[in-house]
Amino acid sequence: MGKGRAPCCDKNKVKRGPWSPQEDLTLITFIQKHGHQNWRSLPKLAGLLRCGKSCRLRWINYLRPDVKRGNFSKKEEDAIIHYHQTLGNKWSKIASFLPGRTDNEIKNVWNTHLKKRLTPSSSSSSLSSTHDQSTKADHDKNCDGAQEEIHSGLNESQNSATSSHHQGECMHTKPELHEVNGLNEIQFLLDHDDFDDITSEFLQDNDILFPLDSLLHNHQTHISTQEMTREVTKSQSFDHPQPDIPCGFEDTNEESDLRRQLVESTTPNNEYDEWFNFIDNQTYFDDFNFVGEVCL
């Protein structure tokens, strides 16, 4: 048989369940006469078929004369809350600070009323602490945001000053850049593969692009005009000889002056008009017979 406390009674021979009024009176009478020095032997001495533990609990919790009946006062509840925070669930020690209250009553009132009453307050306290923490976090966040705004404002001011400085430098170098860009555009046009297809009015003016060709063309036209003038003069002189002018006549001063003006003129269209006007003003004789040497 293992070691341990010996049972106080034979459980097969004891009575269980609620106490009767007769049993309560027997216990009260015995304790008032003899006291309760030994709860283990008290049931046999009092003639009760109960366990010693059951007799002790019945006396302490219900039958002793100083036991308080009724509800706990506000002062007693506050004392229970205070001692429970320091001692925990040690109900017998808590009962020693509350005269007339048993440990069982204190435990019952704690589990039934006080514990439920403290739960909302504790939750509210936890909520308040959480709210305080969130408020503090928001405050810190706002402070950080204000500091960031200050730093960003300083950075923007510095950036604006730097950009204005660069803009001033660009304004000083703008004419030079304009000239460089113009030269680059001209070089691009010269290097472009489709340069011949450009339909610019400037490029379509051949006199501007090729001034030497224009001068050469005018010179050739002027030479051809001179040759034509000579041929017409010869043919007119041969076909319609003038009176009093022998064959192989020499040019008159008026005709020489006109021819010299025609040679020196740079307007071919006016040369023809002046020449034909000169021919029309001459007097020819169709029936004039050449006498003498025939001009070949």
From Swiss-Prot:
Q: Where is the composition biased (Basic and acidic residues)?
A: 133-144
Residue ranges: DNA binding: 39-63, 91-114
Disulphide bonds annotated for this chain are none
Q: Where in the cell is it found?
A: Nucleus
**This protein's GO CC annotations:** nucleus
Q: What happens when the gene is disrupted?
A: Shorter roots due to increased sensitivity to excess zinc ions (Zn) and iron ions (Fe) deficiency, respectively. Reduced production of root-derived phenolics upon iron ions (Fe) depletion. Plants lacking myb10 and myb72 fail to induce transcript accumulation of the nicotianamine synthase genes NAS4 and NAS2 in iron ions (Fe) deficiency, and exhibits nickel (Ni) and zinc (Zn) sensitivity.
Instruction: Share an example GO biological-process annotation for this protein.
Output: cellular response to potassium ion starvation
Locate the region Disordered. Answer: 118-144
Query: What positions does the domain HTH myb-type occupy?
Result: 11-63, 64-118
Record field: transmembrane = none
**SUPFAM superfamilies found in the cross-reference section:** Homeodomain-like
**Keyword DNA-binding found:** yes
Where is this protein primarily located? Answer: nucleus
Q: What induces it?
A: Accumulates strongly in the root stele when exposed to iron (Fe)-deficient conditions. Accumulates upon potassium ion (K) depletion. Induced in roots by zinc (Zn) and cadmium (Cd) ions. Specifically activated in the roots upon colonization by nonpathogenic P.fluorescens WCS417r.
Molecular-function GO terms, alphabetical = DNA binding; DNA-binding transcription factor activity
Tree of life domain: Eukaryota
UniProt keyword list: DNA-binding, Nucleus, Plant defense, Repeat, Transcription, Transcription regulation
Under the subunit heading, UniProt states: Interacts with EIL3.
Its job: Involved in metal ions homeostasis, including iron ions (Fe) acquisition, via the regulation of NAS4 and NAS2 genes expression. Necessary for plant survival in alkaline soil where iron availability is greatly restricted. Involved in the up-regulation of several biosynthesis genes of secondary metabolites involved in iron uptake under conditions of iron deficiency. Triggers tolerance to nickel (Ni) and zinc (Zn) ions. Required in the roots during early signaling steps of rhizobacteria-mediated (e.g. P.fluorescens WCS417r) and beneficial fungi-mediated (e.g.
Query: PANTHER family annotated for this entry?
Result: MYB FAMILY TRANSCRIPTION FACTOR, TRANSCRIPTION FACTOR MYB72
The name of this protein is: Transcription factor MYB72
Mind giving the lineage of the organism this protein is from? Answer: Eukaryota, Viridiplantae, Streptophyta, Embryophyta, Tracheophyta
Q: Which gene encodes it?
A: MYB72
